[in-house]
């Protein structure tokens, strides 16, 4: 969805306005018009939200969060990737005698993790794969300050698709923003999870390949699991740039 949802909070952090506009409406009306009393306000905006994301406790800025609908439903393993969410915030001061234009600049609130698996057997049917990849300790929720709720962690199962031309399994999981120092793990197992072939500590992988996701507007990470005759290895993927960032 290209909708933008704007939240306006007063100086006490109370929600005083909420507006949702489509991209077309924003272009046609050149933004969102707000008529606010004199005072100081915090603007928070999110875009690309779908039914897969829920907003909770939006009435108070200090408590407002958004996160995976599957997490809020209590699913122990989340099978749907997070939305490709972008986030913007700004503090403004309103004086009635002035008309002001304020611009919000959006930052990426998610980091795509691209997973490739090479050398695994082809699926017996389109609906079955002999392997599964779990991403462990991903944050299922973010605060309205654009930071993940670090105390909350979930398991996301990558939805692997088989590429008959290359023989690879590929998937993308949109993780909410995390830091270079993290405890995220990628686990490659057989279907059902009884046998774990390989576990990659993402922080170690990022350090080994000089990958940083901090202080960047946009970032993505790609990792390839490769089966050989005796073991499974984890590599920085050549199919996609391992880290791509616009500063």
Features from the language model and the residues they span:
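A short, Gly/Thr-enriched small/hydrophobic beta-strand-prone motif that recurs across taxa
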Residues: 105-119
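Tryptophan-paired
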Residues: 3-58, 125-210
């Amino acid at each position: 969805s290209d909708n933008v949802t704007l939240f306006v909070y007063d100086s006490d952090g109370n929600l005083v306005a909420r507006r949702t506009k489509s991209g077309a409406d924003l272009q046609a009306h050149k933004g969102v018009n707000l008529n606010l009393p004199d005072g100081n306000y915090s603007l928070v905006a999110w875009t690309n939200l779908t039914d897969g994301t829920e907003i909770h406790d939006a009435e108070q800025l200090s408590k407002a969060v958004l996160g995976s609908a599957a997490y809020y439903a209590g699913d122990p393993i989340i099978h749907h990737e997070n939305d490709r969410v972008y986030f913007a915030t700004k503090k403004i001061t309103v004086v009635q005698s002035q008309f002001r234009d304020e611009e919000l600049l959006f930052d990426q609130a998610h980091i795509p993790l691209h997973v490739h698996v090479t050398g695994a057997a082809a699926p017996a049917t389109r609906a079955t794969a002999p392997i599964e990849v779990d991403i462990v300790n991903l944050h299922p929720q973010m605060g309205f300050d654009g930071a993940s709720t670090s105390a909350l962690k979930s398991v996301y199962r990558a939805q692997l698709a088989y590429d008959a031309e290359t023989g690879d399994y590929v998937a993308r999981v949109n993780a909410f923003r995390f830091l270079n120092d993290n405890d995220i793990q990628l686990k490659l197992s057989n279907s059902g999870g009884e046998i774990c072939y390989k576990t990659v500590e993402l922080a170690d992988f990022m350090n080994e390949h000089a990958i940083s996701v901090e202080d960047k507007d946009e970032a993505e990470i790609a990792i390839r699991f490769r089966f050989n005759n005796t073991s499974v290895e984890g590599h920085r993927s050549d199919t996609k740039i391992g880290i791509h960032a616009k500063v």
